[in-house]
């Protein structure tokens, strides 16, 4: 029994000395955002909720949605903001829709936020599951919700 306790204590001491600064294991689930830099997870948040408007037809006959990004942070030190990306052209699919934009400027309180321009914005609604990915201020962002 003493050997077991000593081994357990040694294992605990080694684990406590871990100086790895990478985030804990991240499991992507509903209403989560994951942020990567050079394919390395640098930030994640389980407290986001993104939603979208009902599809509508813009003046040019294009079917669009507005994306609402509630409590959004693209990097850890960014304040959580409620932002909107209006007028995203969508392509209907049997299970929902998909979209692919080269870039989009989000809005905060009705004002454009060009500093947070979203690049290579891709997304898909499959049933009730919304998946998005894009790049912003040098980070790759993935949302699942």
Model-flagged regions — what are they?
Residues 101-145:
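Extracytoplasmic electrostatic interaction patches
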Residues 72-118:
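Contiguous, well-ordered beta-strand patches that form the walls/edges
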Residues 23-34, 61-68, 93-104, 130-131:
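Short, hydrophobic/aromatic-rich segments at coil-to-beta transitions
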Residues 47-59, 85-92, 118-127, 145:
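Extended lipid/amphipathic-ligand handling interfaces
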Residues 44-84:
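N-terminal glycine/threonine-rich, aromatic-flanked beta-hairpin/loop signature
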Residues 4-6, 14-36, 131-145:
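Bacterial Sec-dependent N-terminal signal peptides
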Residues 35, 40-41, 70-76, 104-107, ...:
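Hydrophobic lipid-interacting interfaces of membrane-associated proteins
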